[in-house]
Amino acid sequence: MSSQQHKFKRPDVSVRDKKLDTLNVQLKKIDTEIGLIRKQIDQHQVNDTTQQERKKLQDKNKEIIKIQADLKTRRSNIHDSIKQLDAQIKRKNNQIEEKLGKKAKFSSTAEAKQRINEIEESIASGDLSLVQEKLLVKEMQSLNKLIKDLVNIEPIRKSVDADKAKINQLKEELNGLNPKDVSNQFEENQQKLNDIHSKTQGVYDKRQTLFNKRAALYKKRDELYSQIRQIRADFDNEFKSFRAKLDKERLKREEEQRLSKLLEQKDVDMGKLQEKLTHAKIPAFTYEIGAIENSLLVLDPTYVKPKKNILPDLSSNALETKPARKVVADDLVLVTPKKDDFVNVAPSKSKKYKKKNQQKNTENEQPASIFNKVDGKFTLEPTLIATLAELDVTVPINSDDVKITVEQLKKKHEELLSKQEEQTKQNIESVEKEIEKLNLDYSNKEQQVKKELEEKRLKEQEESEKDKEN
């Protein structure tokens, strides 16, 4: 941790506190000045009697304003009603004109009946000509129709008269709602308030001056508080950045350590697979084929071991085999080895054992005779018996069996040679798949490590933010 703090400079608390102390001294001075101004404001007060009188006048003004608003509303409603009645009267007069016609000479039934009586008297006198009489009869018919129409429109006329009367009533009410008196009351009341204000103006001016000074001090104090908050915020941000760098460095170091361990383990596992791949590239069945060839050298005097140029620098003469000793199979006797010399267990097929035997067989192109004489008879060496058993080939106990064994060995030799290339390819592909899988597994493990560390970082960040909120 000390090395990290040396690498990342820690914010200096003393520098922050020094700045804050300077601002706190200024704040204390401003608070003292504000307290003095408050006392002065309390000393410059208008007396209670004047305050009460002014309050009464202000309340009276509020009532007058409310009355004026009510008067305005009522007058507006009356004007609206008069407009509606005028519209109704106009509509009703239009209805009357439509029924009577604009050229009607009589507007009442009495006038029409009087004219009918005059016409009847004229006709009854007999002084009229036939044409005059017909005209008067026609006029009388028109008058009778007019009388009917006048009777029908009489309710409309009465309604018009009622509307006119209502309009006159509303106009009288409107004249009664004169706002001038209320306005005069308001002006008188306001004048009294102005007089009180003039008397107390000096006090108010002094108080206003004090209010302005106090507001200026409030503003200056707010600026100091803002500077204090900014200093604290800057320090918190610097410290937060410092902690973030430490956490980032710690997580980075943890990631490097975990990835380093992962890489070391990968190198170990990859080394094993590379060694396995090296063995896989050795032609398949090398041990079995070599064992078969060495067995054939012993069992078949005519057999010539194929030349194999394992090391390109070696001459072909160095790899030539010596003639095998002829097997006399007439009186072969199977000899059971002693426990001290030979254990009757199939030899291990491990790579280590195969490699050891392969090297041994390669170095000894011409094996020593594995036949010994026991009581004047030839016997098989225990190593040959074990090899034939391992190859799953018949162990010869007479001359006929030797031929069978040779045939089986040659057949198995051909089978193994025919499958050698394909099997070698399969062995290599199998190991290469393991290597590919190993690379993929360690790549996934590496991604998992990075993911876990990222989740850890986010979790620590969330916990830090929660602690800060609390």
Swiss-Prot record:
Coiled-coil ranges from the UniProt annotation: 17-178, 237-281, 398-469
Keyword tags: Coiled coil, Phosphoprotein
Disordered: annotated span: 346-368, 447-470
Biological-process GO terms, alphabetical: cellular response to glucose starvation; intracellular mRNA localization; meiotic cell cycle; protein insertion into ER membrane; protein O-linked mannosylation; regulation of mitotic nuclear division
Phosphoserine PTM positions: S260, S369
Residue numbers of Phosphothreonine PTMs: T336
Taxonomy, superkingdom: Eukaryota
Residue spans of biased composition, Basic residues class: 349-358
InterPro entries, sorted: Bfr1
One term under GO cellular component: cytoplasm
GO MF annotation list: mRNA binding; RNA binding
The protein's role, per its UniProt record: Implicated in secretion, nuclear segregation and in maintenance of cell size.
Domains: entry comment: Three regions of the protein are predicted to form a coiled-coil. It may adopt a rod-shaped rather than a globular configuration.
Note: Present with 33400 molecules/cell in log phase SD medium.
Protein name as annotated: Nuclear segregation protein BFR1
Organism per entry: Saccharomyces cerevisiae (strain ATCC 204508 / S288c) (Baker's yeast)
